[in-house]
Amino acid sequence: MTPYSSAADLGSTVSPLEGLSSVITKNTSIVSQYLQANNLPQPSPEANGPVVVLPSDAPQDVQQARQQLIAASLEIFQLAIGPSEFLPHLATNFQYISCLTWLAHYDIFHLVPRDKNISYADLARATGVPEQRLKSILRMAMTSSLFREHPNGTDVGHSAVSALLASDDDAYSYATYMCSKTAPMAMSMTEAHKRWGASTRTNETAYNVAFNTELPLFDDLAQNKARMGEFARYMRSVRSSETVALKHLVSGVDWESIPAGGMLVDVGGSTGGAAIALAQAYPHIRFTIQDLPENVETGEKAAAASLPADIASRLTFQAHDFTLPQPVRAADAYLLRMILHDWPDEQAVKILRNIVTAMEETKSRLFIMDTVLPKPGSVPVSVERIARARDLTMIQSFNSKERELDEWKELITAADPRLQLIAVTQPLGSAMSILEIQLSAK
């Protein structure tokens, strides 16, 4: 993606506001004309508005125009409010989280009919909450595109955003997890640092402060099936995002370079989604999917029940803890997808070393698919701020982090100096990059 030209880069003859206005006008036209030319719906706040603005196969220049439009809109907003109004607008952000939490708790998303309006009075009776309080919270939420009020002032209906949360269980779990877990963790980050400083222990985190537990996040969630189910649905929603779609893994590497009958080991591969996507595209490769026993059992049963024999026969499910030495030796490829960002450097090095012990020099390759943080200002702020929010979430959850390229290089070298980073690829539209690593001869 080309770097975004901020207001400071627009030249001295044009004011920042005028320059950004031109960027917005230009890129709005590109996006709108593409949608019109391809008979696609224009973005709309109405309940029947499209969930996705651009299809995943939209041309690169159109995708970039959308990102430039978002970034310029964010920057012109900041310039227009000025420093004097920064704090009042900042306060709206946590109030939106508060509204979302309240609306989810009282099941407002599902009590508002999908295809018609409902009066505030009837909705208040259905929920057992005071009508005036319901109005106050809904009307605040409406200023961030959640729900829409009928012009009569007495009825409320869905917007495009609230309709999505009402109809998509995974997206709804994303919202409730954000409110019940991510937001409290974020607000506990300072207290965690005051208590434990630069600790990288997984049970000395903002999560531990927020929820008063001595257990690491995953161990704590595992104590409660409902919470673990919410987390699983939340992760399903995250992984369904276009930016982390499996197609980027499938197309982002020259998998044809693996010889016929070669083996790829998906370390921490959950129930096999990534390996199955690769198996469907590359019939010459065999796969071993490794994860904790309950995950591989679930994946193995699902694969046997739903996959054609020519794919299922190339999948092997194996219970394995990646904090222990890798049992599959001399495989052609090992894959760590969305794994290492959950772990502080010390544990991440251990995970890598456990794989290195199984790699065959010059033959085996290790592929890490994870976030590579951009250099500040090198991508549109709309992209950068989401990446940096993920980085903070990793700190707050696990005392881990998203890594810059130099940090990845240091991590790889610390695991074994023989490991050589031979390629870094970020597929178009992917939030993650693929690091290709080989074990050199001694």
Swiss-Prot record:
EC class: transferase
Regulation: induction: Expression is significantly up-regulated at the end of late growth phase, in the presence of Butyrolactone I. Expression is positively regulated by the pgm cluster-specific transcription factor pgmR.
Chain sites annotated for binding S-adenosyl-L-methionine: D291
Result of knocking out the encoding gene: Abolished completely the production of the naphthoquinones derived pigments and leads to the accumulation of four new compounds which lack the O-methyl group, including 6-O-demethyl-5-deoxyanhydrofusarubin and 6-O-demethyl-5-deoxyfusarubin.
Gene Ontology BP annotations: methylation; secondary metabolite biosynthetic process
Sorted UniProt keywords: Methyltransferase, S-adenosyl-L-methionine, Transferase
Residues the record marks as active site: H341 (proton acceptor)
Assigned protein family: Belongs to the class I-like SAM-binding methyltransferase superfamily. Cation-independent O-methyltransferase family.
Gene name as annotated: pgmB
GO molecular function terms listed in the Swiss-Prot or TrEMBL record: O-methyltransferase activity
Pathway membership: Pigment biosynthesis; Secondary metabolite biosynthesis
Job of this protein: O-methyltransferase; part of the gene cluster that mediates the biosynthesis of pleosporalin A, ascomycone A, as well as a third cryptic naphthoquinone derived pigment, all responsible for the coloration of conidia. The pathway begins with the biosynthesis of the cyclized heptaketide 3-acetonyl-1,6,8-trihydroxy-2-naphthaldehyde by the NR-PKS pgmA.
Protein name: O-methyltransferase pgmB
EC nos: 2.1.1.-
KW Transferase (keyword) present: yes
Family annotation (InterPro entries): COMT-like, O_MeTrfase_dom, SAM-dependent_MTases_sf, WH-like_DNA-bd_sf, WH_DNA-bd_sf
Domain of life: Eukaryota
